Amino acid sequence: MEELQGYLKIDRSRERDFLYPLLFQEYIYALAHDHGLNKSILYEPMENLGYDKKYSLIIVKRLITRMYQQKHLIIFTNDSNPNFFFGHNKNLDSQMISEGVAVIVELPFSLRLVSSPESKEIDKSMTTLRSIHSIFPFLEDKLLHLNHVLDILIPYPIHLELLVQTLRSWIQDAPFLHLLRFFLYKYHNWNSLITQKTKMILFFSKENQRFFLFLYNFHVYESESIFVFLRKQSYHLRSTSSRAFLDRTHFYRKIEHFFVDFRNDFHTILWLFKDPFIQYFRFQGKSILSSKGTPLLMKKWKYYLVNLWECHFYFWSQPDRIHINQLSNHFIDFLGYLSSVRPTPSAVRSQMLEKSFIIDIVIKKFDTIVPIIPLIGSLAKAKFCNFSGHPISKPAWADSSDSDIIDRFGRICRNLSHYYSGSSKKKSLYRIKYILRLSCARTLARKHKSTVRSFLKRLGSEFLEEFLMEEEQVLSFILPRISYFSKRLYKERIWYFDIIRINDLTNLS
């Protein structure tokens, strides 16, 4: 970021926030290429254009000019290939422009984050919180004291124009916003945000993934901003007498005028949502709101969120996108795990002088299991088994060497074991490993034109032993003198703080 500040002359850019001229700066596209994007088209050899392996600002300028034209000329050369200067190639155009736009549109947010005093106080030792697994110890500590949850699928905007309007509060450069709006109109389908089922994060095209990821994250940030503000303010409210409580009968009518009377009745409205035991967590397009409150309070939260999305942000919110469930009899489908809080009965023997008593108590226990059915569906989509869970061979890998095939299957198996190490019941995970083991054997047998049984007999019992090694054996290497402890540890949940992305097979489900 320091290198970027030197390029942009931060003091001058803060005064006016002019972003449009940055589109014509060569280092912007160099930064876009160097910051982990896919290989840029601007660096691809363009023999058709007569250019070397480098980007050209002439291309960018002509693409921007063409975006404002009503008609596009298509000029073909002798080999019937469209001329990329004047031809209408939407994929090329959108990728070339979006690479620069994606970097530029992030600048106001990145610079404010770097210059904010809060960012300087961040402890580097807290980097482990980036791990996906770090959220589960938090859930284990908090959910035991709560009763109800709201399973929320964050809605999507009806039109991307709403995102552009929201960006106006952060970006004051009118020409850049106009170009951004025109770019979205011309080169992207507005219905791309209307996703199938619940997958909101998978609609991004591979070419423009960074650009749309930014728009999506900004969309989620704005939708959560007022909710987080209300939540923080409710902590500072003192206990109020019942006369400040709005009439429940007219609650749903009054909530419609929430933003009209926001300033006048702010503390009164906050009293409705005052709940010191509420917890909120989110990953991608799914969020969970848990509370110790009554079902009536959860209904109020649901109605409030729906009205907030529809009336303030103009998001298309369907009633079935928010479900109210009780923690004691409901699984939370989150981050590839099925989590629940189950009451576990136990008997405690109490001795008082000469008499003894047996007391029955119920202890809440946080439980996480592997969702076997979605995982089998993911394996079926990846062609490792059918949808009934019967292992099949992987013909696409049959041309590889034996060691390469074993390494591929082993990598998948180790990643699954690593990601689902926090499961309290390993039976489902063993079944997934069995499917992968037999699929690997079938693939090798197919390659050598043999049966699976004869192939396994020829290799012996040590077949695939290395890449199917259990965590119990790994722990025995780390703790050789306390093997009993390592075996017990393997039966318990293990959370790793080096997992920063969700498992690919979990994303397929």
From Swiss-Prot:
Function: Usually encoded in the trnK tRNA gene intron. Probably assists in splicing its own and other chloroplast group II introns.
Main subcellular localisation: plastid
Record key words, sorted: Chloroplast, mRNA processing, Plastid, RNA-binding, tRNA processing
Encoding gene (name): matK
Subcellular localization: Plastid, Chloroplast
Gene Ontology cellular component terms for the protein in this record: chloroplast
GO molecular function terms listed in the Swiss-Prot or TrEMBL record: RNA binding
Family: Belongs to the intron maturase 2 family. MatK subfamily.
One record GO biological process: RNA splicing
PANTHER family: MATURASE K (PTHR34811:SF1)
Protein's UniProt name: Maturase K
Protein origin, superkingdom: Eukaryota
InterPro entries: Domain_X, Maturase_MatK, Maturase_MatK_N
